[in-house]
Amino acid sequence: MDRPDCDPLLLSRTYARFPVVNRLLSGWRRTYKRRIRPLLAETGHASLLDIGSGSGDVARSLARWARQDGFTLDVTAVDPDQRAYAFATHLPGDKRVTYRLAHSSELVAEGLAFDVVISNHILHHLDARQFAAVLHDSELLCTRLALHNDLQRSNVAYILFLAGFWPLGWGSYIVRDGLLSIRRSYTMAELRSAIPPAWTVESNGPWHNMLVHQHQGSGNRNRA
């Protein structure tokens, strides 16, 4: 689905089915409760940047969970792919979610800052230069916490994903792209050897690794 010439109908169905996959596998509800909600509880409000937001389902879920808990989470969801941006912006809107067609580096250039910076399932799509750039941008953009959630490569994950999600594969890229993503993804040891000292790697459930950066210091950037 990264290919510019992929079938638009299959791609649209893939975006539409991402919420099912993320709800079952990605662990963002757990991460929200453990990582993001405690920050919200301090002031009642926070800003969050979702890098490579795709269909926008994670961004919308986080804003909704915060609202249900009585907090305000203003989410900026950025993706450089026009197709993802078009899909997300044609869905029913959420006043707390803003979509932008942009790279993270553009937000750095604008001097923006967010309490929390996240991504979901993008690291395995990046080459070494892009990987380093996203982590660097995240350090510059976050004022409190950065969390990058990605698949953990394993034979068990590959087999179980194929067995459990094949119904979603019909008419979409879900299974094909999911299996390729697992093959491209990192083990925990590989991530530890690839990240700079300001980052740590944690297990996020049985199928994911999470890169974590706790911001130190302060600056005079433009709060988003």
Residue ranges and their predicted role:
Residues 8-33:
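Class I SAM-dependent methyltransferase Rossmann-like catalytic core
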Residues 49, 55-57, 62-106:
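Class I SAM-dependent methyltransferase SAM/SAH-binding core
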Residues 126-137:
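A short, conserved alpha-helix within the catalytic core of class I
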Residues 122:
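Hydrophobic adenine-recognition pocket in adenosine-nucleotide-binding enzymes
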Residues 143-151:
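Conserved beta-strand signature within the Rossmann-like core of class I S-adenosyl-L-methionine
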Residues 184, 188-217:
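Conserved Class I S-adenosyl-L-methionine
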Residues 151-194:
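C-terminal alpha-helical "lid/dimerization" subdomain adjacent to the S-adenosyl-L-methionine
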Residues 118:
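A conserved beta-strand element that flanks and buttresses the S-adenosyl-L-methionine
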